[in-house]
């Protein structure tokens, strides 16, 4: 709303008697515009004195005095004369009962509260909100009372004063109940504002049990006919819902909520849209999706923003399972990525996902692998390697046994899936021998499957001790036998 109601000079719904020709009104109007001219010229102290003369000319409280006080509040706020500003504000609040219309006073006071909300002096803001609420006890302006209380509640949230916030929420909920003591569904929009406050509080407290309950209520309220929520409120609810889902491991639901939050923030022009887009990318990585989130029409315009570029680089490194590149990107973008507590909360999970994929790739060709070798390759402690292996066994179905005494990872010899640990060399004089893979940190033992393979591959007995030379026909025979093995053990072998 900004200066629209802080600096206006038009008639906003006033009903005047036919007194346009009265001399006092003309004098006050002229004095008001003289003061505005001084303010425009930067002569602020002179402007304040000139605005005060408007109040002196005013016999009965009316529009010109109300407008003059708004201007003086604005000037003294800019000068950081906060005590004087509060004095003018208290004086202005005496006008809201009868001097100006209810609608105009409501919009003007909302504009003033929005205007001073840029101050980082939380005690000043609290004083302003509480002063407004005191003045509204007799004014009977429910909408202004509700809006002021929600602003005060947001302030308590920013200050992490959750006990005070809970008290505000209770008062707001009472105002939304009908005569039977039930929530008045006609006040769906107000209920959503209350839920948004609660949801933010429970998200910050990581109280998922309470958060789920309020989130469900908010989701129901969104679909009521009486609810016409501001996109900013919807964005807040969806963002917190996404955080809740992500912490619960429901990555797909989180992805959906973050995308909805991003769209709502974008519609309202909120800077939170960029933050939520980063959360969307985070969820996209955790669901291990190959779909680029920036392919959507809504997200595409933000693709080249510096903070988002860093996230897209992270996605590429993540999909490539490139641990070194991933860590370098996080280190290079501490301010835009790691400064966010929520993203930081989940980066270790992303790193573990990458390490797990690299781990599986490292052990795939072998039946036995040393834990120390994996530790060296992954650049983590042996304890962390064991932790990753346990997760891979439980979550990814890895068929392996951890032998901590020998420091080895052992693959079961009776597993159905064939592990290509050695290459069988058909030899007439030395049937069934194997040529072991001798990569560092690994060892190879013929499993049951390998033994079966050796016996099938040994071929017809040789007539001499020399190695057989295979003709093209002989190779075809071997190929047919290999196909037979593959159909029996359910895997493909590449020679």
Curated annotation (Swiss-Prot):
Component of the CSN complex, probably composed of csn-1, csn-2, csn-3, csn-4, csn-5, csn-6 and csn-7. Within the complex it probably interacts directly with csn-1, csn-3 and csn-4. SUPFAM superfamilies: TPR-like (SSF48452), Winged helix' DNA-binding domain (SSF46785). It is found in: Cytoplasm; Nucleus. Signal peptide: none annotated. SMART domains: PAM, PINT. GO terms for cellular component: COP9 signalosome; cytoplasm; nucleus. Residues 430-441 have a biased composition (Polar residues). This is COP9 signalosome complex subunit 2. Residues 442-455 have a biased composition (Low complexity). Its main location: cytoplasm. InterPro entries: 26S_Proteasome/COP9_Components, PCI_dom, TPR-like_helical_dom_sf, WH_DNA-bd_sf. One of its GO terms (biological process) is cell cycle switching. The lineage of its organism: Eukaryota, Metazoa, Ecdysozoa, Nematoda, Chromadorea. It holds the Pfam family PCI. Residues 254-416 form the PCI domain. Residues 1-26, 426-468 are annotated as: Disordered.
């Amino acid at each position: 709303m900004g200066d629209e109601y802080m600096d206006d000079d038009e008639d906003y719904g006033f009903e005047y008697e036919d007194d346009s020709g009265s001399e006092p009104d003309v004098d006050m109007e002229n004095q008001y515009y003289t003061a505005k001219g001084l303010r425009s010229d930067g002569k602020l102290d002179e402007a304040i004195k000139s605005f005060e003369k408007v109040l002196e000319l005013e016999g009965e409280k009316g529009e010109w005095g109300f407008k003059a006080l708004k201007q003086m509040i604005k000037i003294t706020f800019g000068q950081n004369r906060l005590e004087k500003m509060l004095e003018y504000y208290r004086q202005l609040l005496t006008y809201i009962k009868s001097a100006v219309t209810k609608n105009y006073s409501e919009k003007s006071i909302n504009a003033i509260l929005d205007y001073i909300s840029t101050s980082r002096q939380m005690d000043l803001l609290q004083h302003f909100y509480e002063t407004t609420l005191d003045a509204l006890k007799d004014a009977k302006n429910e909408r202004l009372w509700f809006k002021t209380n929600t602003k005060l509640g947001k302030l308590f949230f920013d200050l992490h004063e959750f006990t005070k916030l809970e008290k505000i929420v209770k008062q707001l909920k009472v105002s939304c109940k009908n005569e039977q003591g039930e929530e008045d569904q006609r006040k769906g929009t107000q209920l959503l504002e209350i839920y948004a406050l609660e949801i933010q509080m429970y998200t910050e407290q990581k109280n998922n049990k309470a958060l789920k309950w309020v989130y469900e209520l908010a989701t129901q309220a969104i679909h009521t006919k009486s609810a016409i929520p501001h996109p900013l409120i919807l964005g807040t609810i969806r963002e917190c819902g996404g955080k809740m889902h992500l912490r619960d491991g429901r990555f797909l639901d989180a992805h959906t909520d973050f995308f909805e939050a991003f769209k709502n923030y974008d519609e309202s022009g909120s800077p939170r849209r960029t933050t939520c887009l980063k959360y969307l990318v985070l969820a996209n990585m955790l669901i291990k999706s190959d779909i680029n989130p920036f392919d959507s029409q809504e997200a595409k315009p933000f693709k080249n923003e510096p903070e988002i570029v860093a996230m897209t680089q992270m996605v590429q490194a993540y999909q490539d399972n490139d641990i070194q590149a991933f860590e370098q990107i996080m280190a290079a973008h501490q301010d835009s990525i790691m400064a966010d507590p929520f993203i930081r909360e989940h980066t270790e999970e992303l790193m573990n996902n990458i390490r797990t994929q690299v781990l599986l790739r490292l052990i795939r060709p072998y039946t036995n692998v040393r834990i120390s070798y994996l530790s060296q390759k992954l650049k983590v402690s042996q304890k962390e390697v064991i932790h990753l292996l346990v997760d891979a066994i439980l979550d990814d179905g890895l068929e392996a046994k951890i032998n901590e005494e020998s420091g080895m990872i052992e693959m079961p010899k009776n597993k159905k899936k064939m592990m290509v640990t050695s290459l069988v060399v058909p030899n007439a004089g030395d049937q069934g021998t194997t040529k072991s893979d001798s990569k560092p940190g690994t060892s190879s033992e013929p499993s049951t499957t390998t033994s079966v393979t050796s016996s099938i591959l040994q071929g017809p007995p040789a007539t001499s001790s020399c190695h057989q030379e295979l003709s093209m026909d002989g190779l075809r025979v071997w190929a047919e036998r290999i196909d037979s093995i593959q159909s029996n053990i359910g895997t493909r072998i590449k020679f």
